[in-house]
Amino acid sequence: MEYKHRLSELDTYLFAKGTHYEIYEKMGAHLAEENGEKGTYFAVWAPNARSVGVVGDFNEWNAEANKMQPVQQSGIWDLFIPGVKKGDLYKFAVETSQGYTVLKADPYGNASQLRPDNASVVTDISHFVWEDDEWRAAHQEKQINVPMAIYEVHPGSWKKDPDMPGEFYNFRRLAVELAEYVLDMGYTHVELMPIMEHPYDPSWGYQVT
């Protein structure tokens, strides 16, 4: 099936320079429409791969079913697959330069299965609306020459939910108790250790999904 690359020459140029600050809008998995058909557009950077395919429930995890196409000489591979919808599981089947195939979760994925499973999940984040204009405006007025005392904290291990043994606090509850604690202790700022989804809890988030 014919499709067109969604990454322009400017996209690949800025990506190679490391200065494409909206590349997440193109990479990963995005619900899309091609020639009147709804589906999902996939893009991943695998510069040393011989070939890359998309596998998932939709093709019975067959690495040969949906082969991606290289985008110019950028090292990026992409593909539009009709019928792939929100909630579908997927991974990238990467044929290495040595000739063997490995399955990889999406480094730009917006959702993932809960451990110990680790497939990426097609999702839609277009409905999310940032509501931090007031905070950003106030932030611009803050003085930058006043003393700072930063409290570094790992959200997953700072406190556990006493009402649900073994479970983490959600961020809404954590925000209230953590803010009260740091103010009481005299801190002015909080630095959160990695908060991206990660498959191994003891890693503290440094091994991201």
Name what the model sees in each region:
Residues 44, 92, 153, 182, ...:
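Conserved, mostly hydrophobic/aromatic
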Residues 1-37, 41, 71-152, 157-166, ...:
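The feature marks proteins involved in alpha-glucan
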Residues 45-52:
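Short proline/glycine-enriched turn/loop motifs at strand-loop junctions of beta-rich domains
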Residues 63-72:
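Solvent-exposed serine/threonine-rich low-complexity stretches and specific carbohydrate-binding patches
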Residues 166-169, 181-209:
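Aromatic-lined carbohydrate-binding/catalytic grooves of carbohydrate-active enzymes
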Residues 52-54, 90:
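Short beta-strand elements bearing conserved aromatic residues within extracellular beta-rich modules
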Residues 137-140, 175-186:
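Short amphipathic alpha-helices and their capping/turn segments at secondary-structure boundaries
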